[in-house]
Amino acid sequence: MATSISTQRGQVFIGELPQDFLRIAPTQQQQQIQLDAQAAQQLQYSGVMGTMGRLSITVVQAKLAKNYGMTRMDPYCRIRLGYAVYETPTAHNGAKNPRWNKVIQCTIPPGVDSFYLEIFDERAFSMDDRIAWTHITIPETLKEGKHVDEWFSLSGRQGDDKEGMINLVMSYTSVPAMMPAQPVVLMPTVYQQGVGYVPIAGPVYNPGMPMIASPPAVNPQHQTQEVDIQSIKDMFPTIDPEVIRSVLEAQGGNRDAAINSLLQMVEDS
């Protein structure tokens, strides 16, 4: 317990300081703000249950209005769904009637109800040329367990819905979505007179995951040195290994320089 004594400069504390030294207890409003912030963090990082869909899109074929290639046209499809991008293989020399028969498995995040499809002509010596595109809304009938096999109009240089058509087969599967809970650091707020105090959090480990100790690192230089010592020992069997080690370290690990030094030692002896 600290004791108070008077000096020429005023009253000072001697000994262990109290826990509330130079600290002001938070008001009810400050406590409420802190609790609200903690609740917001818990809502943000806690596991959120919901549903998300898995959409299967079979890109069958297309019937295009025009061949934009100089000698041939090698079309491929690109699908953008949410933040993900999927592509089909190139239908080499597919021209106006490319066939892909490519099945693409897409995960539909919550809130996404459409995807964007583009057709490109693959070029060998220049950038690929975009020749057709369309925006497709995912049919609601898919969520009822039905399959959709339809032709969708394509837009392009010929105009809206005038660049041809593409055949897609779609099916939908609902899967549960679980976001893993994240560890949350809740540090007490300390209010200090005249000084801003920012709590520093140490490492936080999720109690649900066991800590795995990392294996000790092996120094490759040490292994190399042991190999060199053994090989030099075979050349100089009468010299103590510790002497060889000392000479090798003195030469900075240079094996040839160490051998020359040992030869000089043997000749001098």
UniProtKB/Swiss-Prot annotation:
Record keyword Secreted present: no
Subcellular location: Cytoplasm
Pfam families: C2, CUE
Entry's Gene Ontology BP terms: autophagy; inflammatory response; innate immune response; phosphorylation; ubiquitin-dependent protein catabolic process
Coiled coil (UniProt feature): none
Domain C2: 35-152
Chain ranges for the short sequence motif AIM2 as given in the UniProt record: 151-154
Keyword tags: Autophagy, Cytoplasm, Immunity, Inflammatory response, Innate immunity, Repeat
Gene3D superfamilies: C2 domain, DNA helicase RuvA subunit, C-terminal domain
Oligomer status and interactors: Interacts with ATG8 family proteins (via AIM motifs), and ubiquitin (via CUE domain).
Family indicated by similarity: Belongs to the tollip family.
Protein name: Toll-interacting protein A
